[in-house]
UniProtKB/Swiss-Prot annotation:
Gene name tied to this protein: pgl
An example Gene Ontology CC term for this record: cytosol
Alphabetical GO biological process terms: glucose metabolic process; pentose-phosphate shunt, oxidative branch
Keyword Hydrolase listed: yes
Record bears the keyword Acetylation: yes
UniProt-listed Enzyme Commission number(s): 3.1.1.31
Sites bearing N6-acetyllysine, chain numbering: K287
Keywords of the record: Acetylation, Carbohydrate metabolism, Glucose metabolism, Hydrolase
Pathway: Carbohydrate degradation; pentose phosphate pathway; D-ribulose 5-phosphate from D-glucose 6-phosphate (oxidative stage): step 2/3
Organism: Escherichia coli O7:K1 (strain IAI39 / ExPEC)
Protein name, UniProt field: 6-phosphogluconolactonase
């Protein structure tokens, strides 16, 4: 398995393309100059395209991925109804979902042969919309509205329209600020990192289209932490055993172990990392974690080790200015 790591740096308007080998070593293979401040990125389900959101001219760009080395070639673009904060796709590669924090909306862009061709639906009134996350069964879109302390739930129709489910939302504790999410591989649990109180909620999907319950909330910060809380990102290993979340103020990654059924998280430790770590990701083997420092302009690679899933630094690399997004593609 070959793996390519893509790093989005909006301040220098670049995507750095790296090869990740089996020993956790990165080799720079390409630097792409992007026509705008590039932030969120996602790889298409068939691994043929990288979709990126840019500002200040709000667009989604599609880059064709070379199958041999992961190199990028521009392919197409489509306008968006707001500044892109988060980007994702459905599991069949039919639609791109874009959450916009500033516009307070989530949009659906249709794909034809992998290329974006236009927005087919927009839902407004999502104050602080910070991500759009498709459920494992490809039916429900989870959309955290950070400023409203709620996660809105939409059914995705065959033509890409979003229909509010019943119930139409789940709510967090007041002032939590739900932000980013991941799903357990067993499809029975979802995990949401809350930006404003730096906590992680565990949601049990008893019925993913209606009966959803928060079964655990864990503080992700050290006991003696007294500064402003400012959580950012969350990811889980492919085997579902280890979960990670980061806080930008502390420049810290919190390490969690996950119970066998996915229902319980346990804090295992803390890893100091790049300054104001905004984004990170786990590779497809579950052996490495790559973290980007928005203020350090560097990325670090960590090996995931032991039963606890603790992080051991393997290497550190300079990238563009203000790196914010990390995507790993296996090919």
């Amino acid at each position: 398995m070959k793996q390519t790591v893509y790093i989005a740096s909006p301040e220098s308007q670049q995507i750095h393309v790296w090869n990740l080998n089996h020993e956790g070593v990165l080799t720079l293979t390409q630097v792409v100059d992007v026509p705008g401040q590039v932030q969120p990125m996602v790889v298409s389900p068939d691994k043929r395209y990288l979709y990126v959101g840019v500002r200040p001219e709000f667009r989604v760009l599609a880059y064709r991925i070379a199958p041999d080395d992961g190199a990028l070639t521009f392919a197409a673009e489509s306008a968006l109804p707001g500044s892109p904060t988060h980007i994702s796709t459905d599991h069949h590669g039919q639609f791109v979902f874009v959450g916009s924090y500033n516009a307070g909306n989530v949009s659906v862009t249709r794909l034809e042969d992998g290329l974006p061709v236009g927005v087919v639906d927009v839902v407004e009134g999502l104050d602080g919309c910070h991500s759009a996350n498709i459920s494992p069964d490809n039916r429900t879109l989870w959309v955290p509205a950070l400023k409203q302390d709620r996660i809105c739930l939409f059914t995705v129709s065959d033509d890409g329209h979003l229909v509010a489910q019943e119930p139409a939302e789940v709510t967090t504790v007041e002032g939590a600020g739900p932000r980013h999410m991941v799903f357990h591989p067993n499809e029975q649990y979802a995990y949401c990192v809350n930006e404003l109180n730096s906590s992680v909620d565990v949601w049990e999907l008893k019925d993913p289209h209606g009966n959803i319950e928060c079964v655990q909330t864990l503080d992700m910060m050290p006991e003696n932490f007294s500064d402003t809380r400012w959580a950012a990102d969350i990811h889980i290993t492919p085997d579902g055993r280890h979960l990670y979340a980061c806080d930008r103020t502390a420049s810290l990654i919190t390490v969690f172990s996950v119970s066998e059924d996915g229902s319980v998280l346990s804090k295992e430790g803390f890893q100091p990392t790049e300054t104001q770590q905004r984004g990170f990701n786990v590779d497809h083997s579950g052996k490495y974690l790559i973290a980007a420092g928005q203020k350090s302009h560097h990325i670090s690679v960590y090996e995931i080790v032991g039963e606890q899933g603790l992080l051991h630094e393997k290497g550190r690399y300079a990238v563009g200015q203000g790196p914010m997004w990390v995507v790993v593609n296996a090919h």
